[in-house]
């Protein structure tokens, strides 16, 4: 009698699980995997994963990692790792189509040296020193998404993040003790062109 009850409970649990999986697969697209082409053009492999919360909100996480040059003694470095958490509100009531706006929280760890660029006032110290540190920021953005069919889409967006960075400055490309520590606040622009696949 006890084993029969256990078998019945197991069958009910399996049926409920199958029904749940079938229900999720029958609903509209729930997830999107994407790639930011602007970030890729900067030679930073990246990937995003986004999920539908309801008919007008999605929640996502994006990450990028630029490990090269892998040689710690290389003179020029532009290595970084980033994570961006974001939420998007879709104004037409259907995720991944039409106008949207959103909010994000950003974290970046970087290791830079011998760079001749000044990205909106940032990284000026990296021209003659190696700097290593973190950026933390929050911001907002807006954009438009096009449905290309067969689950594929493309969206463009622009916005800004208010970011705080703390970094250590070194005299050589691979040294021990820092010569200075600095904190800065920046307003960073955010531009992306994302290609995504929804499922």
Protein language model features and the residues they cover:
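Predominantly the C-terminal beta-signal and adjacent terminal strand-loop region
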Residues: 149-199
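Gram-negative (and chloroplast) outer-membrane scaffold detector with strong preference
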Residues: 51-156, 192-197
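Transmembrane beta-strand segments that form the barrel wall of outer-membrane beta-barrel proteins
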Residues: 29-42, 58-69
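Cleavable N-terminal signal peptides
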Residues: 15-16, 26
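Residue-level preference for beta-strand/loop junctions
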Residues: 13, 29, 41, 79, ...
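Sec/Tat signal peptide C-region and signal peptidase I cleavage site
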Residues: 22-28
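Short, surface-exposed coil-to-beta transition loops
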Residues: 43-46, 139
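Bacterial N-terminal signal peptides that target proteins for export
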Residues: 2-14
């Amino acid at each position: 009698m006890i084993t029969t009850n256990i078998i019945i409970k197991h069958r009910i649990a399996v049926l409920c699980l199958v029904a749940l999986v079938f229900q999720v697969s029958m609903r509209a697209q729930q997830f999107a995997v994407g790639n930011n082409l602007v970030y890729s053009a900067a030679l930073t492999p990246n990937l995003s994963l986004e999920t539908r919360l309801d008919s007008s909100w999605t929640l996502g996480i994006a990450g990028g990692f630029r490990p090269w040059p892998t040689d710690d003694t290389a003179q020029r470095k532009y290595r970084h790792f980033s994570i961006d958490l974001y939420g998007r509100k879709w104004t037409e009531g259907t995720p991944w189509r039409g106008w949207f706006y959103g909010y994000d929280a950003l974290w970046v760890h970087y290791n830079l040296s011998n760079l001749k660029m000044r990205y909106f006032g940032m990284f000026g110290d990296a021209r003659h020193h190696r700097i290593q540190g973190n950026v933390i920021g929050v911001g907002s953005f807006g954009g438009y998404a096009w449905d290309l069919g067969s689950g594929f889409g493309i969206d463009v967006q622009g916005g800004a993040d208010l970011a705080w960075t703390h970094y250590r400055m070194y005299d050589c490309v691979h040294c021990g003790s820092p010569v200075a520590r600095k904190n800065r606040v920046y307003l960073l622009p955010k531009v992306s062109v994302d290609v995504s696949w929804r499922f």
